[in-house]
Every structure is written in structure tokens, then in C-alpha cells.
Amino acid sequence: MVIAGLLFSLGAPRVGKLYDSMQYREAVRELVSAAKNARRDAFATGQPMDLLIDTSGNRYALTNQSQKVDVEEFEPLPAALDISVVYAVEVSPRPGLAAIRFYPAGGSSGGEIKVIRPSGAGVKLTIDWLLGAVMQELI
């Protein structure tokens, strides 16, 4: 009983860190997939697709009608992550809502998405303006 209690007390903090790490990795995967899906959908439908990121609410959405996007269309990201976006303000539907637009020809408006953990480590996703490619780099 004592040994089990000791093992639990030593393992509990690690489980919390493991869970945080898992959430971070899943959030990065979701954003990369969303950007790639937006690029693919723009090409397939012949209509521009926007990857919208609400940095204050830590959520994102894919849409081809960014002016009419509804709050319920957004997917949540972990609140513990600090998300910042460099984007072309011309394609943003409203202040405080970042948008990276993917065009049917394969290009995009370009931009960078930084996802930072509470520890300060993170990743930068760069969306190329010419080809719409998504690149990932540790920061």
C-alpha cells in the first residue's frame, strides 16, 4: 500500500505533463491539417477557403464564407496554449479574427501561426504565399 502510494505521488505530476504535451501536439496537428484541408478544398471547389483563427478564444474554423462564419463552426484549441498569427489584414473578416486565405490556383495570402506552450517552447507554422504549402519549425 505504501509503495503504491509512493509510486502514485511520483507519477501524478508526470501524467499532467504528459497530458499537456499530448494536447499541444494534437493542437499543432489540427492546425496543420486544417491548413492543408483548406488548400485542398480551395483547389477542389474552385472557391477561396479561409482558415480563421480566433486568438483570444483559442479556436479555429475553415470556411468559404468568412463574413458569415458562426461561432458554432469553430473548433476549440487548448486554452493553455498561446496562439499568435501573422496574416494579411485585407482577408480578415473582422478585427481580432486572423484569416489565411487559400486560393483555387494553389497559392495563399500567406502567414505564420505560432503555437507556444506554457513552458515557452513551441512551433511556428509558415504558410507559403506562392504555393500555399505548410511548413513546421520548432521555436
Q: What residue ranges belong to the model's regions?
A:
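N-terminal signal-anchor/signal peptide hydrophobic helix marking the start
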Residues: 1-2
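N-terminal helix-rich module
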Residues: 6, 10-36, 40, 44, ...
